[in-house]
């Protein structure tokens, strides 16, 4: 069965980090999604996870202006708690941000593609309408 085209693209911290480092392959993926009318989303928490002391703040602001930054709501938090529980009782201390990004992926229009370097973590947290693509 042919996979449906994505209606939402969600970035994890490594995908965002690559954009911040001006990785050409990542920039091309994002631009292709934008050209296809697919919104490119990032959780507000992912920003904090992806940034480090040497991040160029001007570059960060420019990259974020080209993405849809999504806030974290109480509903997202409760969904994340359920995802952690359903994944065998994963602990929020280690998996909190991934679980909250997974909650974001579950509330946006499906089908959803998540760009991540953590395929193993995501295989535990994603819903049936969320596909994983490695960066």
Which residue stretches match the model-derived regions?
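Residue-level signal for well-ordered alpha-helical positions
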Residues: 22-23, 53, 83, 125-128
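Short, hinge-like loop/turn segments at secondary-structure boundaries
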Residues: 57-61, 87-88, 131-133
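A generic structural signal for short hydrophobic patches within well-formed alpha-helices
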Residues: 16-17, 47, 77, 122
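Short loop/helix-cap segments at secondary-structure boundaries that form the rim of catalytic
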Residues: 61, 121-128
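Histidine- and aromatic-rich ligand-binding microenvironments
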Residues: 11-12, 42-43, 94-95, 130-135
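Short, well-structured N-terminal submotif of metal-dependent ribonuclease cores
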Residues: 1-42, 49-67
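Active-site neighborhoods of divalent-metal-dependent phosphate/nucleic-acid chemistry enzymes
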Residues: 3, 69-119
């Amino acid at each position: 069965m042919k996979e449906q085209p994505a209606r939402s693209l969600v970035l994890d911290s490594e995908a965002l980090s690559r954009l911040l480092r001006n990785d050409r392959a990542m920039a091309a993926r994002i631009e292709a999604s934008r050209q296809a009318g697919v919104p490119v989303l990032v959780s507000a928490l992912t920003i904090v996870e992806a940034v480090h002391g040497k991040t160029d703040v001007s570059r960060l602001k420019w990259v974020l202006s080209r993405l849809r930054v999504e806030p974290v709501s109480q509903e997202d938090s409760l969904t994340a708690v359920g995802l952690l529980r359903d994944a065998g009782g994963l602990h929020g201390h280690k998996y909190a941000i991934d679980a909250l990004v997974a909650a974001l992926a579950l509330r946006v229009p499906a089908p959803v593609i998540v760009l991540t370097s953590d395929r193993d973590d995501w295989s535990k947290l994603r819903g049936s309408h969320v596909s994983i693509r490695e960066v």
